[in-house]
Amino acid sequence: MKCPKCESSIRKEDQMTNGKCIVCGKDCESDRICGNLHLFCDDCTERLIRERVKEICRDSASKDPYSVLEELYEDDIIRTRFLKNHILVGSALATAYNNCLSEKMDLDSVLDEIMRRGALIPPKACGHAGNCGSSVACGIFYSVITDTHPLTPGEQWGDVSVLTGSCLVDLGRIGGPRCCNRGALVSMKDTVDYVEERLGVKMEWKDRKCHYKGWNKNCKGEGCPFY
């Protein structure tokens, strides 16, 4: 990711530095700095990274949503700072879905809305509220692409809840402790199947084994179907 001021690369430092954010000018303590020593506050970093998410999604030609998610996971800045499936899962689904359409969506607008809603999902919602962020992100994705709102009549309104509910049920049956990647795999697979059934759009999917085991010290190991 490039500094908007000087175009040099932004990196993550091991230590925090005090200074003024080069974007908004407020005093901040940050571990994000560019090659010319410009600092970035948390709020501006998140805005820049959301733009990075959109850039990766725009450039992706994949019709497999998990492949898009891996592209996001593997970006240095996103991985170390902004790994929130609440936002990334829906963005990856929208990208793969759009790549399957002959008449494309306004992907930037769709991603903006998915990320806006995804940011409202509280952290640790899986254990504190029975709502996995990845599962809810799938519901957000489906709601946005079908333009469903609280007063939408008929089955369309219910489809969003049915999808989210099926993701949660399938994930819950595996048991804890939580794993964000497992939540993404279960929920995205359910969503791929549901979109084909309800909307007639066939995204790509292949069975996978997890190669992010090292990210989760509480990995279930052989108790996880993706181990």
Task: Put a short name on every predicted segment.
Residues 1, 18, 31, 38, ...:
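Residues immediately within or flanking Cys/His clusters that coordinate Zn2+
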Residues 19-26, 65-76, 108-126:
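Short, hydrophobic/aliphatic alpha-helical segments
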Residues 85, 125-144:
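Conserved phosphate/anionic-ligand binding catalytic regions in large, soluble enzymes, centered on
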Residues 3-6, 21-24, 34, 41-44:
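Short cysteine-rich clusters marking metal-coordination/redox-active sites
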Residues 145-146, 150-196:
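A structural-propensity feature for long, helix-poor, extended segments
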Residues 8-12, 29, 39, 49:
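Short functional micro-motifs and their immediate structural scaffolds
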Residues 59-91, 177:
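Polybasic, low-complexity association/targeting segments
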Residues 11-13, 17, 31, 106-108, ...:
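Flexible, glycine/charged-enriched surface loops at secondary-structure junctions
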